[in-house]
C-alpha cells in the first residue's frame, strides 16, 4: 500500500508539472487572442471538476452525464454564487481543483506579493531543478479563490496532508487563546513563519478525493451548517434547506464555529472532529522545539551600548550652520 501510494503521488506531481508548464506557455506566453479561455479543470485520477457560468437549473442539461444512474461518487462539492470580487469568466467559475469558497480573501494582494517573493529561494527535494517550471505558483488572471487554490495545491503536492495545508492558510485566532493547547499554538507559530494567513470572511470547502472538509474563517463571518443522517450521508452548505432532508433521518446537526474545521476521511470511513484533526497535526513534529531553536525574539537581542552625547555637540553644530 505504501509503495502504491508513493507511485500515485509521483504520478500526480508529474501531471501537476505538465499542466503548469503547458498552462504558462499557452495563457501567458502565447500570442493567441483567446488564450485565457484555456483552463485545465482537473487532470486528476480521483476528481472530475465540472465548470461553467451556469445557474443550478442549467447544470444537468449542460452536463447530462451527471444524471446517468451508473455515474456514482462518494462526494460532491457544488458551488453556485455570483462573482462579486472579479469580472466573471468561465475559468474563474467554481469549484476550483481542490476547493470552493463562499466569501472573499481580503489579504489577497499581500498574499500574492509574498508568494512571488518566496519563489527566489524556493527549493524542493521532490521537484529538484524543475521547481522553477511551477512558477508563478499563484497564477495571474485568477480570482481570490483561484489563487488560494493554486497555493493549497502546491502545499499538498509538496508533501503536506490536506488538513495541515488548510490549517497553515486559514489559522485560528491562536495568539491570545488561553484555552488552546501549547502543542497547537506551537504549530501555528511555526506555520506563521512559513505562510501568512489568507484572511477574510470565508467559508472554504476542500477535497483531494480521499478527504473532504470545510473550514470557517477565524472571525466566523460566513455561515456553514451541516446535517448527518442515519443512512450515513453528510450535507454541508452555507444555509439550511439546500437539500430536502426528512427530520426523522437526522442524527446530528450543527454549524461550524469560527476557525474550526470539519473533515470526513473516506479511507478511515469516519467524520473527524476539529479537536482530533488538529491534535494529530500539532503532534506530528516537535514544533515547540523548532520554534525555540530557530525563532529569535527582538526582546532577546542584546542591547546596544549607550553612549552619552558630547556636552559641546550642540554649540559645535550651530557653529557649522546646523539648524
What are these regions (language model features)?
Residues 36-66, 159-188:
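Amphipathic alpha-helical
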Residues 55, 82-84, 104-106, 111-113, ...:
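Short, glycine-/Ser/Thr-/acidic-enriched flexible segments
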Residues 80, 87-88, 193-197, 216, ...:
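Anion-coordinating catalytic cores for phosphoryl-, nucleotidyl-, and glycosidic chemistry
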Residues 65-91:
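Active-site-adjacent "gating/activation" loops or surface patches in catalytic cores
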Residues 76, 89-105, 109, 196-236:
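Conserved catalytic micro-motifs used in adenylation/nucleotidyl-transfer and phosphoryl/amide-
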Residues 182-202:
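Phosphate-interacting basic helix/loop segments used at nucleotide- and nucleic-acid interfaces
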Residues 106, 112-189, 240-323:
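Conserved catalytic alpha/beta cores of large enzymes that bind or transform nucleotide phosphates
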Residues 1-12:
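Single conserved hydrophobic/aromatic residue that forms the stacking wall/gate
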Amino acid at each position: 500500500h505504501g509503495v502504491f501510494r508513493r507511485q500515485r503521488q509521483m504520478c500526480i506531481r508529474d501531471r501537476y508539472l505538465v499542466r503548469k508548464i503547458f498552462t504558462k506557455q499557452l495563457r501567458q506566453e502565447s500570442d493567441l487572442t483567446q488564450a485565457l479561455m484555456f483552463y485545465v479543470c482537473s487532470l486528476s485520477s480521483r476528481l472530475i471538476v465540472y465548470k461553467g457560468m451556469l445557474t443550478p437549473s442549467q447544470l444537468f442539461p449542460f452536463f447530462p452525464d451527471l444524471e446517468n444512474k451508473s455515474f456514482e461518487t462518494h462526494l460532491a462539492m457544488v458551488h453556485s454564487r455570483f462573482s462579486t470580487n472579479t469580472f466573471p469568466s468561465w475559468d474563474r467559475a467554481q469549484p476550483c481543483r481542490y476547493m470552493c469558497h463562499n466569501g472573499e480573501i481580503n489579504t489577497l494582494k499581500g498574499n500574492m506579493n509574498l508568494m512571488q517573493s518566496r519563489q527566489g529561494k524556493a527549493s524542493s527535494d521532490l521537484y529538484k531543478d524543475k521547481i522553477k517550471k511551477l512558477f508563478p505558483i499563484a497564477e495571474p488572471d485568477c480570482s481570490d479563490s483561484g489563487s488560494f487554490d493554486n497555493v493549497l495545491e502546491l502545499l499538498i503536492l509538496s508533501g503536506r496532508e490536506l488538513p495541515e495545508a488548510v490549517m497553515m492558510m486559514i489559522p485560528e485566532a491562536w495568539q491570545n487563546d488561553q484555552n488552546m493547547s501549547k502543542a497547537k499554538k506551537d504549530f501555528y507559530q511555526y506555520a506563521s513563519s512559513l505562510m501568512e494567513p489568507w484572511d477574510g470572511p470565508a467559508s472554504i470547502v476542500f477535497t483531494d478525493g480521499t478527504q473532504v472538509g470545510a473550514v470557517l474563517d477565524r472571525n466566523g463571518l460566513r455561515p456553514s451548517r451541516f446535517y448527518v443522517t442515519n443512512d450515513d450521508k453528510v450535507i454541508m452548505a452555507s444555509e439550511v434547506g439546500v437539500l430536502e432532508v426528512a427530520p426523522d433521518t437526522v442524527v446530528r446537526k450543527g454549524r461550524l464555529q469560527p476557525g474550526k474545521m470539519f473533515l470526513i476521511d473516506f479511507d478511515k470511513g469516519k467524520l473527524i472532529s476539529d479537536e482530533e484533526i488538529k491534535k494529530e497535526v500539532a503532534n506530528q513534529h516537535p514544533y515547540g522545539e523548532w520554534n525555540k531553536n530557530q525563532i529569535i525574539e527582538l526582546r532577546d537581542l542584546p542591547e546596544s551600548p549607550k553612549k552619552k552625547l558630547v556636552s559641546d555637540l550642540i554649540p559645535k553644530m550651530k557653529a557649522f550652520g546646523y539648524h
